[in-house]
């Protein structure tokens, strides 16, 4: 969904048929407002906020940038426009910044806990309906990378896909003939044997799903000897406390759905000058 279309929908959701305050406002005038943080975090949502302000004729006098850290009481944005329009935009603007910064902040905590420049931290497709692009943009601002944006990015085969596949190697041979040349094939595995079979069958990426660090290390050791060009991804209930151990197991990437679905809003407010 294009940013403008997304923002138009978000604004309309809040405005309904119009802000009732306009009926009681005797005369409109120019005013200045400040968006300030009430807790620390990593800023995200700048691109969406600036587009929203431009759409509504509000001037952004000053803003901090995506990926910047902030502390409680810091001024994140200074905006100026018609008093009535500032009030119309207030909640939508805050929702965008609070939600996006919440994801970026939690993602950054995982990046710091990962403590590795060799292992990539990835998000997942566990996103809120119609918010995927927005939420994955927020992950990038937190310092991680995006996994697939959708089903058309790569062929990922899970247990539900493979339930009725009798010969995995033959299936992958058939798949490659029907996929774009650049499309990767990733197979989700829940045991050493499944991972071994996936590599033997020709998978480009093997996901070690819900496996212990020890089990993951065994798969890494097998990969390193027999299929050094296969990429390994660890996934499944990986926490801030365990992510560093998984990083040290030798995998190439770690995907964490919690970056998005466990993130909470960063508290902010808007105050008039």
Language model segments and positions:
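Short secondary-structure boundary segments
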Residues: 210, 236, 258
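A conserved short alpha-helix in the GNAT/GCN5 acetyltransferase fold that borders
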Residues: 220
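Conserved hydrophobic residues forming the short capping helix/wall of the S-adenosyl-L-methionine
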Residues: 223
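Structured functional modules or segments
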Residues: 234-235, 240
């Amino acid at each position: 969904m294009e940013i403008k279309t997304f923002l138009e929908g978000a604004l309309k959701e809040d405005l309904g048929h119009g802000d009732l305050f306009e009926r009681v406002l005797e005369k409109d005038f120019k005013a200045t407002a400040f968006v300030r943080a009430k807790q620390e975090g990593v800023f995200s949502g700048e691109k969406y906020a600036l587009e929203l302000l431009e759409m509504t004729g509000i001037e952004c006098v000053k803003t901090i940038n995506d990926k910047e850290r902030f502390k409680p009481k810091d001024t994140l944005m200074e905006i100026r426009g018609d008093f009535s329009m500032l009030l119309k935009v207030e909640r939508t603007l805050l929702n965008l910044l609070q939600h996006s910064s919440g994801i970026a902040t939690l993602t950054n905590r995982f990046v710091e806990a990962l403590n590795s420049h060799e292992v990539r931290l990835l998000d997942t497709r566990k996103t809120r309906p119609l918010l995927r692009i927005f939420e994955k943009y927020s992950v990038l601002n937190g310092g991680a990378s995006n996994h697939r944006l959708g089903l058309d990015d790569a062929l990922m085969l899970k247990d539900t896909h493979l339930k009725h596949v009798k010969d995995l190697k033959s299936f992958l041979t058939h798949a490659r003939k029907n996929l774009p040349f650049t499309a990767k094939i990733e197979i989700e595995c829940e045991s050493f044997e499944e991972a071994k079979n996936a590599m033997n069958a020709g998978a480009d990426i093997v996901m070690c799903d819900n496996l212990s660090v020890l089990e993951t290390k065994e798969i890494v050791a097998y990969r390193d000897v027999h299929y050094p060009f296969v990429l390994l991804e660890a996934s499944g209930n990986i926490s801030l406390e365990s992510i560093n151990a998984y990083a040290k197991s030798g995998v190439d990437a770690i995907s964490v759905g919690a970056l998005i679905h466990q993130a909470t809003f960063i508290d902010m407010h808007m105050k008039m000058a």
